[in-house]
From Swiss-Prot:
Name of the protein in question: V-type ATP synthase subunit D 2
Keyword entries, A-Z: ATP synthesis, Hydrogen ion transport, Ion transport, Transport
Lineage of the organism: Bacteria, Pseudomonadati, Spirochaetota, Spirochaetia, Spirochaetales
GO MF, one example: proton-transporting ATPase activity, rotational mechanism
Family to which this protein belongs: Belongs to the V-ATPase D subunit family.
Gene it is expressed from: atpD2
Stated role: Produces ATP from ADP in the presence of a proton gradient across the membrane.
Amino acid sequence: MKTPLAPTKSNLAYVRDQLGLARDGYRLLEQKREILFMELTSLLEEVHLLETELDKRRKQAYASLWQLLLAQGRDDIAACALVTPVPCRVQQEVLLIAGLRFLRLDAVMQPPKLQYAALGSSACMDRAREDFGLLLQTLTRMASVQTIVWRLASEMRKTQRRVNALSKQIIPQMCETCMYIESVLEERDRESTFVLKSLKARKDPTTTL
């Protein structure tokens, strides 16, 4: 505590109360930091797995597209794409981590409403559509998890700064203030005791100081 306080019993009680609150806050922030760290570690492992899956899905999707180009040509593919929308629904899941609210998104692919067999398509079209749908699902999941990771990392940095401020500045300053007030009050008590004994000694010469 940078502001000096008068060394009184009431101020000592006040500082002790504040010190207790600061220590409680420190323990709660430590618990929050540990929870954030565990969740962040778990999500980083998930990101690593998603990166591997994403690389696999991307290679498979573009391989299917290449096969489709060889089988049907660019013009037929463009014609099918114009008349065949690919429905995609986004699911939202609310996650609560250490009192924080996050949204996790997942893309759910649905069968196309219009069949395009009459346009001269082949099984390659179905395979390419399916592979790119899986790629979109993985991309959506990856973006969602990475956003949560970024927010968790940001929150963890803020929590760590608060923990450091409490442990290295606020709590030590409060302890120092408590010790200062206690020492002054003890010195006053000793002086008061000495004065009382001196007064008694004057009244009764047999009294020992």
